Amino acid sequence: KCDIIIHSAAMISIGFDAYDQVYEVNFVGTKNLLDASINKKVKKFIFISTVNAYDKKPIDQNFDEKRELVRKGNAYDMTKALAQELVTSTEEIETVSINPTSVLGKNDFKPSRLGKIIKGVHSGKLPFLVDGGLDVIDVEDLSKAIYSSISNGRDGESYLISGKFRSFKVIYEVITKYQDKKSRIFFFPRLMVELSLPLLSLFPIGLLKRAAEINGKFFPGLENMTKEAIENIINFPKHIDNSKAKKDLGLKISPLEKTIKDTIYE
């Protein structure tokens, strides 16, 4: 007998995947698993969503779980929002939605898209970044919050699992602490990036995907800098409120130095 389902499987798309394909995995897959959980009388269904399920604008105001779910945007954001709405509105079993920000830390074997960027900067193979930032959460802090939600997550509630907003310049300075020789890096100015982004929409998806793959061979991590990823970096909310997760789930935040070090070495 299974009492708890923690559903973390998803297709993370950054602009190159067809909407129908992402929808099939992120929404239909979640619905199928939720239906099966109800039929098998599972006690609690914990859905690992994302901060991207929420409407990010305005980015300079307090960002909490009362924000509207996103209704337009890229396939990943929209399908995760639809799945979260489905899960949290279910009445047949207890449900909880966990909404992490940008996850980094130990055992990033593949590595993840952000992990690859961190490791690319650390190795000196990625000599430039966008002048933006992200809210980083340590994978161990996230895991503890998910575990706590089994007992402490309230039915039908969503929880933002966030750390603190950090600019890529701050992240870069932390990375250099773990370099034998400090690498040089160029940050593309935000205004220049914002003016250039509309031009990417003029090119076919297939061509952009191939160009990204080629760039990634020379500069590891650069293949993940798609139009959607860059928009996320330059428009990431700066005031994500994790007080609800701290109160209900006992969320504690690790120092950024620990998270970056674990990403590089563990």
Model-based region annotation:
Residues K1-V25:
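NAD(P)H-binding glycine-rich loop region in Rossmannoid oxidoreductase-like domains
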Residues I4, Q21-N32, N74, M78-T79, ...:
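Glycine-rich NAD(P)-binding loop of the Rossmann-fold in SDR/ketoreductase-type enzymes
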Residues V28-Y76:
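Conserved Rossmann-fold NAD(P)-dependent oxidoreductase catalytic core, especially the SDR/UDP-sugar
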Residues A53-D55, I93-L114:
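Flexible, glycine-rich beta-alpha linker
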Residues I59-S97, S102, L126:
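Catalytic helix-loop patch of NAD(P)-dependent Rossmann-fold dehydrogenases
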Residues I117-I137, D141:
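A conserved pocket-lining segment of Rossmann-fold NAD(P)-dependent short-chain dehydrogenase/reductase
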Residues A145-M225, N242, L256-I264:
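Mid/C-terminal beta-alpha module of Rossmann-like enzyme folds, strongest
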